[in-house]
From Swiss-Prot:
Keywords: ATP synthesis, Cell inner membrane, Cell membrane, CF(1), Hydrogen ion transport, Ion transport, Membrane, Transport. Its main location: membrane. Belongs to the ATPase gamma chain family. Produces ATP from ADP in the presence of a proton gradient across the membrane. The gamma chain is believed to be important in regulating ATPase activity and the flow of protons through the CF(0) complex. This is ATP synthase gamma chain. GO terms for molecular function: ATP binding; proton-transporting ATP synthase activity, rotational mechanism. Gene3D superfamilies: 3.40.1380.10, ATP synthase, gamma subunit, helix hairpin domain (1.10.287.80). One of its GO terms (cellular component) is proton-transporting ATP synthase complex. It is a peripheral membrane protein. CDD domains: F1-ATPase_gamma. It comes from Ralstonia nicotianae (strain ATCC BAA-1114 / GMI1000) (Ralstonia solanacearum). GO terms for biological process: proton motive force-driven plasma membrane ATP synthesis. F-type ATPases have 2 components, CF(1) - the catalytic core - and CF(0) - the membrane proton channel. CF(1) has five subunits: alpha(3), beta(3), gamma(1), delta(1), epsilon(1). CF(0) has three main subunits: a, b and c. It is found in: Cell inner membrane.
Length: 291
């Protein structure tokens, strides 16, 4: 059994670790609230663009934007959204497992793939498995800006428009609530009809005609590009909210485990100290009896 000095050192070490995990838990909780607000504030923008784009697309049925052209999938692009940092539980592991399954399915169908990595963890993973990475963006910080994402996203959008790839998929972690996050792989392009179909209420709200400047086609082109960019930004915002939630939960679990370990070590320390005192008393009593 270890001596009391070694046990005291171990207790001190675990206490110091617990201070770190507790501080990280509090920081993650603060960042989580801001990330959730950012995620919620991004939703109305994407929804408003979708409504306007849907109205204009239905008002001009003779024009079909390249993003809406459906082709047989022989080549595909995959945008992978992960975190830049670790210590967030199984968040990255789960979404990268979904990415692996998607890549395997594409490979089994004879579909070539190219990837865009958003986040260091995804970039490292794609490099390890030998995936073809055509663009990436890392170190977004706690406040992602669309300007930083556009360059990496544009590579995939341009490839789809040029017919170099026939579909684009988006992999990220969807935020459900603080305790639950869900890895998803969604089709980003071509845009499906249900994404640009208006409900009866939306048709009522957007029943007017527009005056286009310079022309309807140019406006629809720009709107759909902004809409797809907004979808990717929303995915990044949800991924960041998921990251901070997962990190807060992971650090809380680490702090609770450290507390339990400290309690167990304290018990061992007390038993060891008691055994040492009992031994000393026995030696004293034995020595006195011998005299």
């Amino acid at each position: 059994m270890a001596g009391t000095k070694e046990i005291r050192t171990k207790i001190k070490s675990v206490q110091n670790t617990r201070k770190i995990t507790k501080a990280m838990e509090m920081v993650a909780a603060s960042k989580m609230r801001r990330a959730q607000e950012r995620m919620r504030s991004a939703r109305p923008y994407a929804e408003k663009i979708r409504n306007v784009a849907a109205h204009m697309a239905q008002a001009n049925p003779e024009y079909q934007h390249p993003f809406m052209v459906k082709r047989d999938v022989k080549r595909a692009g995959l945008i992978v959204v992960t975190t830049d940092k670790g210590l967030c539980g199984g968040l990255n592991t789960n979404v990268l497992r979904a990415v692996t399954n998607q890549l395997r399915d594409l490979q089994n169908k004879g579909v070539e793939s190219q990837a865009t990595a958003i986040g260091s963890k995804g970039m490292q993973f794609l490099g390890r498995i030998g995936a073809k990475v055509v663009s990436n963006v890392v170190h977004l910080g706690d406040t992602p800006h669309l300007e930083k994402l556009i360059g990496a996203i544009k590579v995939q959008l341009d490839a789809f428009t040029a017919g170099e790839i026939d579909a684009v998929y988006l992999a990220y972690t969807r935020f459900i609530n603080t305790m639950r996050q869900e890895p998803v792989v969604e089709q980003l392009l071509p845009l499906t009809a249900d994404k640009l179909t208006q409900t009866a209420a939306e048709k009522q709200a957007y029943s007017w005609d527009y005056i286009y400047e310079p022309d309807a086609q140019t406006v629809v082109d720009e709107l759909l590009i902004r809409y797809v960019e907004a979808l990717v930004y929303q995915a990044v915002a949800e991924n960041m909210a998921s990251e901070q939630s997962a990190r807060m939960v992971a650090m809380k679990a680490a702090s609770d485990n450290a507390k339990n370990v400290i309690g167990e070590l304290q018990l061992v320390y007390n038993k060891t100290r008691q055994a040492a005192i009992t031994k000393e008393l026995s030696e004293i009593v034995g020595g006195a009896a011998a005299v």
